[in-house]
Regions:
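Solvent-exposed alpha-helices and their adjacent loops that cap or buttress functional pockets
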Residues: 2-6, 10-11, 40, 100-104, ...
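Internal alpha/beta core interface subdomains
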Residues: 9-11, 15, 32-36, 159-167
């Protein structure tokens, strides 16, 4: 990514919102809007995805269209990279997957709508996003955890794992 070589600010963006989060054509519009918002804030957007089994950090508009239009993309978390690469698959990266790839590329800031967390009334369903937040040295800017989750348990898990949670203009853990 040229922006990293020039020592300019770079913000990583996930791609599962494009591949699995929203229907067409809203998914493509959101991808373009996210990149536009990063540019307007003075940084370079770097949407992370897999294309033909290769990790891409920063996508062209044509690549965004390809992801948005595809019905066969994989959902790629941290644990799924090896399988997706071997299959030469296209894939949208989750929060954990994006953090992993961005960190390997030297990107330290990542923005997303919402992180995963501890699921309600579940035997033991905890998103790998939380472990990644504890282990990968990346600043994650988000609107909070997804509203369908057990927010108090998610916040407790983050505290237990030593993840600082900082709210901007709020005293609550937002969803």
């Amino acid at each position: 990514l040229i922006a990293l070589d020039l020592d300019t600010p770079v913000v990583a963006l996930e791609s599962t919102v494009i591949t699995h989060g929203l229907p067409r054509p809203q998914n493509l519009q959101l991808a373009r809007d996210m990149e536009k918002a990063v540019r307007e804030a003075g940084a370079t957007p770097a949407t992370v995805a897999l294309l033909e089994g290769k990790i891409h950090i920063g996508l062209s508009d044509g690549e965004l269209v390809r992801l948005a239009d595809s019905e066969s993309t994989l959902k790629v978390s941290h644990r799924d990279f090896a399988t997706a690469i071997v299959k030469k698959a296209d894939g949208g990266t989750t929060v954990a997957g994006t953090m992993y790839a961005a960190n390997m590329a030297g990107i330290k800031v990542f923005a997303t709508g919402g992180i995963g967390g501890v699921h309600k009334e579940s035997a033991f369903d905890i998103s790998t996003d939380l472990r990644s937040l504890a282990e990968i040295p990346t600043i994650v800017v988000c609107a909070g955890a997804k509203a369908i989750l057990d927010l108090p348990a998610t916040l407790e898990y983050l505290e237990t794992m030593g993840v600082p949670v900082v709210g901007y203009q709020t005293d609550e853990f937002p969803a």
